Amino acid sequence: MSVQTTKRRLSPASIEALKGERPIVSLTAYTTPIARLLDPHVDFLLVGDSLGMVLYGLDTTVGVTLDMMIAHGQAVMRGSERSCIVIDLPFGSYQESKEQAFRSAARILKETGCSAVKLEGGAEMAETVDFLVSRGIPVLGHVGLMPQLVNTTGGYRSVGRNEKEVAKIRRDAKAIDDAGAFAIVVEGTVEPVAREITATLRCPTIGIGASPACDGQILVSDDMLGIFNDFKPRFVKHFAELAPAISKAVEDYANEVKARTFPGIEHTFQVKR
């Protein structure tokens, strides 16, 4: 009699336990094929609302809907088996009230099978984080630069450059930590401030444009693979340059189709005689 075993996914609790043990590795994923490629190498995959800009060509993440996040979350779940899957709560799906946040987050977990949700916000969202966590929904926090607030902050710029901003980041990070987040993304924050809050928080920090001292790092996959070239943030490193390779492959395909050299006989079905 054989016993079938399935790989056990990393959980939010296991991500939290990595603080002080080793750096946490994370990337974004939006589709099944990419999730399959990333899954063996990362601790958690974030189905980020950045998909609005990367996949849908939106100028900001504000236009992303809950239905979009759920559809892509389902795709990433199908393409992964070991990494913890976290899905962004999109703009407008949680800010109105903690009850609205619970309804949105519960729907995401029930319809995708993911392990946790992420939300942006500082001290003003601490009550919501506590409300979700106390009702069985793990939360990944997000402080510093908050892309969903781009319309009120005036653009994508690093934060922590004056005492007022530093005080806010400290206050926000502590509030979300105290509310029970299993980890906190720290985005676009000057290095000394990101380093400081990493040393003081209970939960791990996940840096993106923050500090190498953060407990982990995350990047948008299409950025680090050199696919999304609309703009390149200072904090992005291209670990590959796939855009030129893709362009060249499509050019070669087009040329072969026009020259009738593709498909070759080996790419066709023949009748056996």
Curated annotation (Swiss-Prot):
Q: Which residues bind 3-methyl-2-oxobutanoate?
A: 49-50, 88, 118
Specify the protein name.
3-methyl-2-oxobutanoate hydroxymethyltransferase
One GO cellular component, as annotated: cytoplasm
Catalytic activity line of the entry: 3-methyl-2-oxobutanoate + (6R)-5,10-methylene-5,6,7,8-tetrahydrofolate + H2O = 2-dehydropantoate + (6S)-5,6,7,8-tetrahydrofolate
Q: Does the keyword ATP-binding apply?
A: no
Q: Which organism is it from?
A: Sinorhizobium fredii (strain NBRC 101917 / NGR234)
Please list the GO terms describing molecular function: 3-methyl-2-oxobutanoate hydroxymethyltransferase activity; magnesium ion binding
Role, per record:
Catalyzes the reversible reaction in which hydroxymethyl group from 5,10-methylenetetrahydrofolate is transferred onto alpha-ketoisovalerate to form ketopantoate.
